[in-house]
């Protein structure tokens, strides 16, 4: 049996972050070979990580990364907010967002991509992090937006570090106009999106099933009225609904006397040409995952915007 020294155990702990007894066992199992012990611990850690996958990961961070006319948004979940404040976790999320810039805009392609500064993939690096920290984590979703001319504006709410927070937004503005002006306008619209959480750009982007559900509610509320009256009520009710949930029709949070569409039209003079809001993406941390009620981040943004 190899002579396992305290210095060897310390070295292995520094390399892996594993516990002292685990490091000692690894060295005994590998006859004191440090690199083999690292692999032994990784295998053991990964086995433990697989067991943790059943636990709900609803905390974590969203991250944005921008390259001017191209930007990415990712959400990585953890089980606790404590881990979200961990430097190693934050570094992983930040790097994942950078890698996402050159991904196909889906989780599978990002997981398979090379993780910078390593000889492994993004997926494997996350598994290593799970083994080291001891908490389940998931790369939940990723999105990218790009324009041939114009800007992709970004905004992060609840920011814990540069580009990392609780709500992340990307806004694509297509225009040949002044980039500095477009960047400012785009950020304002991104803040608006964070606060109001629109379902789509305009009515054409609303799921037909959602429209039918709203129509059914209006018909039920006004049951018994003549058909021609009911039709007008439904039409009017849907128009009001669209103003609430479609980005272009919403009152602009920075100036509620105007809609976002009107703001874009007025911006053309300052931009020096037409400005088209082509797309947006909004991720709110943990949305759709069952968990205990947390802070209403959208309300926080709305309050911040209104001063």
Curated annotation (Swiss-Prot):
Query: Carries keyword Protein biosynthesis?
Result: yes
From the UniProt entry, list the residue stretches annotated as the region Involved in Mg(2+) ion dislocation from EF-Tu.
Answer: 80-83
* The keyword Protein biosynthesis appears for this protein: yes
GO MF, one annotated term: translation elongation factor activity
Which PROSITE patterns does the UniProt entry name for this protein? EF_TS_1 (PS01126), EF_TS_2 (PS01127)
Taxonomy, superkingdom: Bacteria
* Annotated GO CC locations: cytoplasm
Localization recorded for this chain is:
Cytoplasm
Q: Which Pfam families match?
A: EF_TS
NCBIfam families attached to this UniProt entry: tsf (TIGR00116)
Name of the molecule in the record: Elongation factor Ts
Organism annotation:
Methylobacterium sp. (strain 4-46)
Q: What does the organism's lineage look like at the top?
A: Bacteria, Pseudomonadati, Pseudomonadota, Alphaproteobacteria, Hyphomicrobiales
Write the gene name.
tsf
